[in-house]
């Protein structure tokens, strides 16, 4: 019987823990599942590179994965911020790429899958991640971090201060 008491106590503790985790998870942030509702006008990567040839702007590439919870939170809370969306829509070519994708793109003058660009060319290993790309297609810098709307807005303004220097790359 003492073994049965231990098992029963363990089951009760496990059940209590499961209920606590479940209750906490249900109070988490609302996550946007449909990217079509985003305020940011996301472009195809190839189209952004083509457009940048005739109308030079920096290309802001957001890398995400379907399994990345912080990426979904960024979609819901940061990219749906009217100020952030306005800056991205008017001052940059905004691109969203699935880091797990096997689609081919040209990154830093090399044709690779998005996944290979993520790991090998841009040397990223965490999500969410951002790559700033010059109009000629060369990456300028990478950032791996989740941010608030205010932090991203500040970072975008910092990019714009260096835009003239970076556009020629």
Feature names for model-found ranges:
Residues 9-18:
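Bacterial N-terminal signal peptides
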Residues 49, 82-160:
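Thioredoxin-like thiol-disulfide oxidoreductase module
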Residues 161-166:
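The C-terminal output helix
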């Amino acid at each position: 019987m003492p073994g049965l008491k231990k098992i029963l106590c363990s089951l009760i503790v496990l059940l209590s823990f499961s209920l606590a985790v479940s209750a906490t998870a249900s109070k988490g942030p609302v996550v946007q599942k449909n990217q079509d509702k985003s305020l940011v006008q996301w472009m195809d990567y190839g189209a952004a590179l083509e457009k940048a040839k005739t109308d030079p702007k920096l290309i802001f590439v957001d890398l995400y994965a379907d399994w990345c919870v912080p990426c979904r939170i960024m979609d819901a809370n940061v990219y749906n911020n009217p100020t952030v969306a306005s800056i991205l829509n008017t001052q940059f070519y905004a691109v969203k790429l699935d880091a797990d994708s096997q689609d081919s793109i040209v990154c830093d003058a090399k044709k690779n899958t998005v996944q290979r660009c993520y790991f090998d060319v841009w040397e990223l290993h965490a999500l969410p991640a951002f790559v700033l790309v010059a109009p000629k297609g060369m990456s300028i810098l990478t950032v791996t971090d989740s941010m608030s709307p205010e932090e991203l807005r500040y970072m975008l303004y910092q990019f714009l201060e260096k835009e003239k220097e970076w556009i020629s790359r």
